[in-house]
Amino acid sequence: MRIPRSRVFGFTFVFGLAVLMSSNVEASWKLADSTKQLVVGVAPDWNSSSIVLRRFERSGKSWRQVGEPFNGRVGAKGLVWGRGLNPRTSDMTDKSEGDGRAPAGAFRIGRSFGYEGSWKAKTKLPYVTVGPRDLLVEDPTSPLYNKYVRLDHDPETASEKKQQMKQDDPTHRLKITIEHNTTPVPIAGKGSAILFHVWRAGGAKPTAGCTSVSDAAIETLMGWFDPAKEPVYVLLPMSEYEANRARWNLPLIG
């Protein structure tokens, strides 16, 4: 991929300190008190591609659900542990590129993308109006793996064209970055370009690893997420949610 003078961006858009850590991260880790917005996605089990999502806001130490639960789809093969904010243990199975699973765990929310420039004024998230020079690099052999790139030239090589962000696809008319495998640096082959986006066939189809939701839901998320509130997305199977809820400082769900 030819990249001279291109603008290269990591996915990560850091809102501030999003986690609390000590030398014993497994025992002490929890969502930071500064995280005031939370989206929780829960699947029945590790192999399910269907989830229920809920939005929460926090005042003081209490979480309050915002709006009604809504449905989503994830990887066709279900979930697998991703690389986000939560600590990792030696027995975790990692997500890998092309495995058909969505990353589970806790993740920051990053920049958003869309086809309509008008959304820049309607969201508080950093917003990119997508054009033909915008790439999301999913090639594990590239030094730009799991990064957003804006070329200073129209795509020329087969590699550049393959990494182009989708154009004129209603499923990708709006999307929001889920910060999987971004910090401290992306690890090659551990999964890339994980996003919220619009679902296909009215929710009848799973994804390759992203979280897909309805048109109405993606617009709600675009208008609701506020970087000042350090939003986080937690995606887990129910068994892991119940096991980690109190330790991670997560809300009760019905």
Protein language model regions, located:
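Cell wall/extracellular polymer interaction/catalysis modules
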Residues: 25-208, 216-254
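Bacterial N-terminal signal peptides
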Residues: 10-20
